[in-house]
């Protein structure tokens, strides 16, 4: 028997076989396994925050909330799951692992690597956002809004992927122009629009599930998108995918002292 299995780790495929899957009212399939430190009501409310039209596009996905999903270093044994947390195992884990389970795509999310409800929710909604873009693409009305913002050189972006692909799309590092207009890299533009949309979908869902300050999304690698530009994106996403019953979308601005 492999050392990883001997140390108490379990194959992800076994977790999937042995754990009963639940479905929220919006149609998302999910379950929890092991010592996740999650309250079931909080978990259910987070999963139920996914708007129904988005959830319908994720029919092949099942989300497994586990203490730790081990990183690629143990790939020879397949994806392994730790049913409990230890610092040593935590050092070998990753935020999530995608696992093919026959007709189902399993997403195993490491709850114990994500220090609080905000971090867990954002990891979940980022996964949902990417999966939705893969399944449904990007609405043209969103493309038009975001590209107009990029051409107008609004400050910042919503992720490093969006920031880097946007910079590559509009002239790259050379800033080359033809007839005074930037040369557009169409491949980078497509990547930018997809990243911006999946980010907006994730942040929108996060706002339905958790009250948070926009500054909490700040990263050192890129400047955050200007608040007004983000608000325009989120309002459009909310119009396309209204909140489920029992959830509310609201943007509140803090007054300057």
Cite the ranges covered by each PLM segment.
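Generic structural signal of hydrophobic/aromatic residues within well-ordered alpha-helices
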Residues: 46, 50, 150, 166, ...
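A metal-dependent hydrolase signature that marks the N-terminal structural subdomain at the beginning
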Residues: 1-117, 240-257
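Catalytic glutamate of the conserved HExxH
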Residues: 123-136, 200
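Post-HEXXH active-site segment of zinc metalloproteases
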Residues: 118-122, 134-173, 213-222
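Short alpha-helix boundary/capping elements
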Residues: 74-75, 133, 137, 206
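Short pre-active-site segment immediately N-terminal to the catalytic Zn-binding motif
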Residues: 107-125, 186-189
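Short glycine/proline-rich turn/loop motifs
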Residues: 175-183
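Pan-zinc metallopeptidase signature
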Residues: 1-22, 182-257
């Amino acid at each position: 028997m492999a050392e990883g299995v001997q140390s108490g780790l379990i194959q992800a495929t076994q977790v999937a076989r042995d754990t009963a899957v639940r479905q929220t009212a919006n149609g998302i399939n999910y379950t929890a396994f092991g010592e996740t430190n999650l309250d079931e009501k909080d978990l259910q409310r987070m999963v139920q925050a996914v708007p129904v039209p988005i959830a319908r596009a994720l029919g092949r996905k099942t989300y497994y909330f586990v203490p730790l999903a081990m990183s690629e270093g143990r790939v020879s044994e397949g994806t392994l799951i730790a049913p409990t947390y230890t610092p040593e195992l935590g050092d070998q884990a990753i935020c999530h692992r995608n696992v093919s389970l026959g007709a189902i795509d399993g997403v195993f999310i490491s709850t114990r690597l994500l220090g609080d409800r905000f971090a867990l929710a954002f990891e979940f909604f980022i996964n949902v956002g990417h999966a939705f873009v893969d399944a449904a693409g990007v609405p043209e009305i969103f493309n038009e809004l975001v590209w107009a913002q990029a051409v107008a050189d609004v400050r910042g972006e919503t992720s490093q992927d969006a920031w880097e692909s946007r910079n590559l799309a509009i002239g790259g590092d050379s800033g080359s122009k033809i007839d005074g207009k930037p040369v557009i890299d169409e491949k980078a533009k497509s990547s930018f629009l997809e990243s911006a949309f999946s980010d907006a979908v994730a942040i929108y869902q996060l706002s339905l599930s958790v009250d948070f300050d926009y500054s909490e999304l700040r990263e050192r690698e890129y400047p955050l998108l200007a608040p007004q530009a983000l608000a325009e994106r989120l309002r459009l996403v909310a119009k396309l995918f209204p909140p489920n019953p029992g959830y509310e979308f609201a943007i509140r601005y803090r007054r300057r002292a």
